[in-house]
């Protein structure tokens, strides 16, 4: 039987200080699990790979939050169930998210919602293609050996819009709502192979 009081070892140091996660402190935070997610992201280098696909138009001397850190924050938000970029406003001072972004709990705040929004509007079509290729590269690196064949499941998913976002369109197939409909590609083991933008129609309508 596993002792629930044992600490979780192997977490990376932050600001030169050791990080120890224990399970004997009660319900202190609902987002402590992102420290484990952070370790996975570090090993795969997802944020750094995606950031390398983008061109940062900002003046280097004025940059506070690098593209990789903004992407990493957004990835961790989604992993923790905060799918809306507006949640960055309340999470930018959350101690767990600060630690996941290599900041001490008392360190500076993470990027704001407006910074996240600018990031999401930054990529042009060529950058999006580079991002898709980077995801494919991550997928290929996850394979222990070259398979004889790969079965791909290509499907769409719907992301409802709750305002006047750019490029939102009405889709009668999903509850008569406005939103976005990206395409996602999985293999037979349900690993994400890649994703892409959409033409705002259901595949059955295309």
What are these regions (language model features)?
Residues 1-204:
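Dynamic "connector" segments at or just before major functional cores
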